[in-house]
Amino acid sequence: MAIQALLVILAVLLVLLFLGVPISYAIAVSSLTAILSSIDLNVAVLTAAQRTFVGMSKFSLTAIPFFILAGNIMNQGGIAKRLVDFVMAILGKMPGALLVTNIGTNALFGAISGSASAAAAAVGSMIRDGADEQGYDPAVTAATNAASSCSGLLIPPSNALITYSLASGGTSVAALFMAGYIPGIIWALCCCVVGVLLAVKLGYKGTPGKFDWKNLGICTLRALPSLSLIIVCLL
């Protein structure tokens, strides 16, 4: 019975995906088809209704839309721009300044919004214009933004870790958050290393002149409210 249901799910899912049906609808239809094909109709209807209700009543899921909403509000409020300026003030002298700035800002923005897609959209849109003006390859810029935004999936608060906690049967969200810091930071550092190596190879230089401590102080003060949100989101 279990093998039959699995085969039905796979067959219906593949057919629907091949026909271009959105993934969410394809998964829902294939799951319902498997239930209807393996148990009585009345029981199938009750089972589908019960599982739908249980899935929608998980309180932890409410954190995900609120984190995304917070990220969008912060983006509209200019937080992403202040974070970009702050990271640029620190890492701007390195080869490929815009690449490493993109990576560092994605890590910080992901730690605020909990969403890799929000970080990629907010930070990438600001980095893109400057990268085009300075002659960066758009493919390299886009790849750097996409790869480094994944640190937002690991550095808490993470929507992916919340979803994993629910899917795994109640693994502690706090424990997952604590376990996500080191991998997220390591991923960001690895992206920085690759970004610098690419910059050296392609001839992308850092900002000219000496390190500007005054500019760093100004950018830090401007970004301080944004940086404090990392602690607020975790609390």
What do the predicted segments below correspond to?
Residues 1-235:
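Alpha-helical transmembrane segments of multi-pass membrane transport proteins
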